[in-house]
Amino acid sequence: MPDDPSPSRRRFLGDAFALGASSLILPRAFGAVREPSGATVLESDDAHIAIAALDPPSRVFVDHEGTGLKEARRASAARFTSAQGVVELAPEGAGIGVKVTCPNGPLTRVVLRWTTTYSPMSLFLGDAWERGYGDLQWRFLQPERVMPWYFAAHDPSSGRTVMYGVMTQPAAMCFWTVDATGTSLWLDFRNGGGPSRPGNREIAAATIVSMTTRPLTPLAALSRFCRLLSLNPRVASAPICGNNNWYYAYGKNFDADAMRRDATFLAEISAGHANRPYCVIDAGWTPGSSAPGGPWTKGDVAKFPDMPALAADMKRIGVRPGIWIRPTALTVVDDPKRLRRGPAHDEEKPLDLTLPENLELIRSDIARMRAWGYELIKHDFSTYDAFGRWGFDMGAELTEGKWSWADQSLTNAEVILRLYATLREGAGDGVLLGCNTIGHLAAGSFEIQRAGDDTSGRAWERTRRMGINTLAYRLPQHGAFFQIDPDCAAHTASTPWELDRQFLDLIAKSGTALFVSVDPRTVTPEQKSAYREAMMTALSGGARGGAEPLDWLHTTAPREWRIGGRRVTYQWEEAWGALPFRV
């Protein structure tokens, strides 16, 4: 961001960066040198990367009651005060830490504002609150656009990419907006749909970092920035791959024998590879709807009478057992006091995630599945259960107003962080796959994250819209936050094999997590050969050199890819083109 003429601000920044530069974890190929500006420049054979500390914001605004923003008074270069609180900026690692105290009242939002300008040719990309919904894209300047957690501004004419973000696991829900005169970071401290009441404690709200690169491609730039944002990811020891029965069963008409059949198919298409894949039992192994809640003490008595025995059978077949759970809601409610207030739209009732007894229930449910022998636990629906909205509808509001958790001292981000820590504790050394989870809060707790909304075994258009988009636009997070799961490469009689086959090929070669979803009874010899080739590639980490979308600046479903140094064109469209209807 532009230099500020104030000597005190410049001194503050220089000191901040001097303290933070040594803590960076960077590729060995780079060497660091100090420029007179105070930025650190990382030189390699092909890139110039500057990790520059931001200037303090020119203005700070606070909303305590949820009634509107009011400008805070600048007490010093790094301290801003309101009637009931204090916002302080301090050096923290490679960036600037934002700390907030509000001992005597409520706290809703804080907005940090910088005066900035960007090249008129710039295209902007932000992240999403949870999964992508086919809506991730580089876009022209749109002042009201909510860009959660981080954003990039890329100038195609110069090849320069400027990126700003907050480090993973912040204590506030954070998003950015950019307009013609400035850049704003919005920090949401609410509890449920109303203000939090943090009391006499300091909230370490976020750490802000920035990076500028040239002439790296936008993907390479964002990939390096994501590694800077997440210094302590939970890294699996090998690529995570397997199969999942959801897109041919959809939670109905399957049993333990069907899962043994799935396990046998997976063992066959991965035979000979040392990295053993996971066979995941998706929703439907307990009574209830297609997305049931707890209790999670046993399987459906008729269809899944012995869950530990099924896990043992899968291991004997030669695969690793995995299982699905919705840990944050109940189908059978033993005590209404367990439930949170606020929006609840399903028969499954959401738990209040601030109650200790509910966190203990969640921990024990996850631990029980590990004790049964399941090595990968796919947990689902927690963001929807927490806020009553899907990611595409969260926007700046996140949830409906006028409700709160039982413990109002916590921010929503802190509530979710505690949930993820509880899931991690229950899973022990097992693999956690988060679905409908908040990636920026999950990094460091989960090995793998579902990055987009569901693909489909019913309509190819859904796979085209969701799967390809999320693979391309969440690829920078792969290996930086966790392993990326772009969702299943599915195939049924309702979807065209030639298009499904291409998606299968792209996932396998990209190095992201490949999960296939197909009924083994329907697979032809040609298809089985394709599944085996893809699975063996994916288990080995994808194509050498990885995959990069080449046309993603101009489309939401990239067709042109560089894979292993070779340019590949995929054909995603059906005969009539893309379907413009809701899927």
Question: What are the residue ranges of the model-derived segments?
Answer:
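N-terminal export signals
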Residues: 4, 11-32
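C-terminal segment of N-terminal export signals and the immediately downstream linker at the start
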Residues: 26-48
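Carbohydrate-recognition beta-sandwich/jelly-roll modules
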Residues: 40-277, 376
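Short alpha-helical segments and helix-capping/turn motifs at coil-helix boundaries
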Residues: 96, 227-228, 264-266, 306-310, ...
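Active-site-proximal substrate-binding groove within the catalytic cores of carbohydrate-active enzymes
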Residues: 199-201, 244, 408-583
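Aromatic- and carboxylate-enriched substrate-binding clefts and catalytic-loop regions
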Residues: 275-491, 527
